[in-house]
Amino acid sequence: TFPSPTDQVLSELGLKARSALDCCPIYKFTNFSKGVPQNGTPFIHLCRKVMNMDKHTERIEIFKSTLKLIEQGWYITPSGEQMELPPAMWTIDESKMYSKPFVVDKPKFKKTTIRVKNMDCVEYAMTLIDRGYNPALLNLADLYTPGGLVEYGSGAQEENLCRRSNLVVSLYQFSEMRVRQYPSLDLIVSEDQYPMDERYGGIYSGCVGFFRGPESEGYSLLDNPYGISVISVAAIAGPRIGKDGMMPREEENLTLDKIRTIFRIGMDNGHDSLVLSAFGCGAFANPPAHIAKLFHQVMEEPEFKNAFRLIAFAILDGYRTGLRHNPEGNLLPFQKEFDCVPQNGTTAL
């Protein structure tokens, strides 16, 4: 007997049940090519019923809990201590929306170190902070909706970040509808509003309080929250892809300007490092090999060469890999582009 979705979120027993539901081979197949089990029900429908819908429910409950913690401003850690969250007003005051190109005049570093890591982007940003860096974390944002589909339990990266932090208090102020929907957050409607500009749009959220672990650990509350600044920029959704696996020139040029916007926002706010990801290569189906090349191209442009002490791509291959747009997954194309394929299974920081 498995706990209800709410109990699964809140209890250790529930987490074990969740793991069992996701991993247990419940159905036997008579036709693997069509994915039809013996009872004749299409496998995808069974997945939605037994697994995915439960996950969506759990994510929705986690987000509701996150909103309550943001409102009260503190939580009880796993070790039993009361931990104060970074004041939401800090994040709100340090937030701004960008919609035009601009140039940042700042000193350059002697060189930029490039890393491609197979790990959670938030955890890698925390590692950099512990090592003395001042990173900004890229949020793979939705162009039209702050937080994407977080209220509906989506598993994409932006929604994951919103469940783990107070990022929404920054993003929601740029949506009059969200400000009215969540009066308890005490937000003031910004003059700048969603949707973001398609070419130069981005949002900087300073000192976002991250206080939950990754989904793989049940979004457990952290003993020590981290303040991490976030850059939200939206990739192209569903670009055209040729037989060579590349986007046409129009989409390429648009993506280049989006990448330049990410870099400029990081520079404009004094960050010495960026934690990026496979920009748009999941739900938005951008080709990772081409996206990696475009990042590399922008890094070598005079405006951005050595603008950062470190640029890292933290990439976890999820369920949307091995598809037409990313047959090798998302991690490997970036490793190849930046010559970061691990040797003997190890890589540096």
Predicted regions and their residues:
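Macrodomain-like recognition of ADP-ribose-binding/processing modules
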Residues: 14, 21, 29-35, 39-274, ...
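Basic, glycine-rich
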Residues: 26
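Extreme N-terminal basic, low-complexity initiation segments
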Residues: 1-9, 15
